[in-house]
Amino acid sequence: MNKKITYSLNYRKPKNEYSSDDELTVCVRYYQKLDNGKNKVVKKSTGIKCKLKDWDSDWHKADNRHPIKASDSNYLEKNRILKNKSVDLHSLIKDLNESKNISPLNSKVPKGPLDLKWSTHKNNVRLVSPANKRNIDIIVVGTGLAGGSACATLAEQGYNVKAFCFQDSSRRAHSIAAQGGINAAKNYQGDGDSVYRLFYDTIKGGDYRSREANVHRLAEVSSSIIDQCVAQGVPFAREYGGLLDNRSFGGVLVSRTFYAKGQTGQQLLLGAYSAMNRQVARGKIQMNTRHEMMDIVIVDGKARGIITRNLITGEIEKHSAHAVVLASGGYGNLFYLSTNAMGSNVSAAWKVHKKGALFANPSFTQIHPTCIPVSGDYQSKLTLMSESLRNDGRIWVPKKIEDAKKIRNGELRPVDLNENDRDYYLERRYPAFGNLVPRDVASRAAKERCDAGYGVNKTGEAVFLDFSSAIIRYGKEKALVKGLDIEDFELVKSLGKGVIKAKYGNLFQMYEKIVDENPYETPMMIYPAVHYTMGGLWVDYNLMTTIPGCYAIGEANFSDHGANRLGASALMQGLADGYFVLPNTINDYLADDIKTGPISSDSPEFNKAKNRIEEKINKIMTNKGSKSVDYFHKILGKIIWNNCGMSRNKKDLNSAIKEIQKLRKEFYKSVKVTGDQFSFNESLAKALRVADFLELGELFAVDALSRNESCGGHFREEYQTKEGEALRNDDDYRFVSAWEYNENIEQSKLHREHLDFESVELKNRSYK
């Protein structure tokens, strides 16, 4: 039976309307010759792109991105064709790339069944003896949950750890702000949870854009995280009988979230911090606070240290090690206004990217649906209201636009609006999940209602989060338990408030301090805001970037959440990476360094990197501009929010790229940094961070423009269902976008890591 492959360009308009630089889809058809002599198409793929100027009839023979050739038909027949079954071209492309060593991306995912990959991998990685560990240094940049847990565990194993953070203390890391909880597949509620369900919910929540093996590993180790934290003394909430309590978060139908009131991040960070302090006291961790990473140093192709700036003295310092671990968090502050701490930045990760590490899925950003709305242009920070509030709070807007206008103008109180005049739109649209749909779904729905004129605050960009029903429900339950009159409305209301206060008291207090309204008596006002970044440095299964010896963990990497993170999974990933994954995988790399000896920081590579940083700082300090750093940061944030926020389109993304390019040129021409570089200078620190944001912002827009589909938090207006839901394109975009740095950001090279799913069926997400 004869077989052949053909290649053709997919023209969507007359050929003469294209320019030579236009990128077209290549259609690959695999034919099977039937007994009657006719050819039948048994499979076709349109996942490859080619610029018109690069196309010719022999394009496929030379193109390294898609090495399938007609001469490969024997390979196809031997490896992929079983009688009349069609070939899976996505799997074929992956196999061919790996067999010919063409792709620069090697995920290093172990072979074998999905549920055995991690245990098998752990049993086969090389180890380093305790006697050799004491001679090996590891630098960890960032001491939040991921970095702090990694520092403590690596030092406990015997490595010498050099930890760096730009805060006064690792207790000031942004991890402390996490509120709602941490997921784990312990099934304490007996509601059908399991490792597989946590794995599946995470894959589905990420809209099938994450690496299957990494996500399953995360679900596997989740239970161990809870055991570790309980052993440290983390005061998780408990039921009356003393068992650990759970609650639900968005995108799931079980209760698997462990929590410590509304301060879960703080308590988990204190656990990691205490473990770190034990190793600091033993001399195994050298803690360097108020130090900011300026560059990574690569010697003989390996990460061997970093350059830092002492934020107090301004001194540029050289620090060497056998490996470097980045745990520097996400880049939400690219938007200027976000729920992130003011100092959170992308600089450490971006410096590594500029030295050769690929940056994955930069446009995959999470917009959290429950945040305190923007109240004015003077703001520089937004405040999160935990997703846990959606367990008991009901989200609504008025059914009638005229009622919304009256509420905005102060003519009507929300508590005076009848139930029949309220639109609980999430419950209406998604009856199965209701108010606990995933964050990207809830955020887009809130935006749609406000854009349609139903917003309830003065700016028209807010919806209500109402606890009145929960207060009465809990109050009646409490009254029944106590044998009290459930018809006594004031008594029931008082009892219900007590239950809500026990669950969310600190969150309600924080809301009242900021907004000056009592959420026990009137609904909260909320609106989506930038909260988390799923994108980050590309890493393999071992959490190593494309720079040997350089690892990225926690929010600094792209690893586990695809196009949308489920609530309470950030803390899970950070602690999984730090406590359980990295300490196992890094040994395999460091096994080659047991005879290396100390790494010198006096090499030409270190000196060159230090000189380059000093020159850059001198250039910024001597600039004769007149505009503040915040002036540029705020404009950048508005460009990104308006053009690359909750919804995107080709026109706006192209506009954003041009605007950011123009803004970056103006920044280096007009920025003014006051003070001097040899003392504490927050203006200088900000300027260096914003300079990196101005480059990342362009790549962010380029990435969003290149992905012609909607998935998770990446919503392209051109690609949506009739109901306004995200419309994925699995044939063409089932891959991780990994970008190679180019000084001309718009020309950054895209590498694709194709995603294969063994245990999950690809289907459109539905939460109805």
Language model regions located:
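Conserved redox-cofactor binding core of oxidoreductases
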Residues: V230-E315, C371-L384, F464-D466, K476-K478, ...
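N-terminal Rossmann-like FAD-binding beta1-loop-alpha1 element of flavoenzymes
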Residues: I136-A163
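An anion/pyrophosphate-binding glycine-rich loop and adjacent beta-alpha core
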Residues: L358-Q509, N584-N587
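Extreme N-terminal leader/targeting segments of oxidoreductases
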Residues: L105-I138, E156
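Glycine-rich FAD pyrophosphate-binding loop
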Residues: E156-Q179
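Long, amphipathic alpha-helical stalk/connector segments used for oligomerization, subunit docking
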Residues: D588-S679
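Glycine-rich loop(s) and the adjacent beta-strand/alpha-helix scaffold that form part
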Residues: A323-Y378, L382, N564-N584
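N-terminal helical hairpins
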Residues: L34-G37, V42-S107, K111
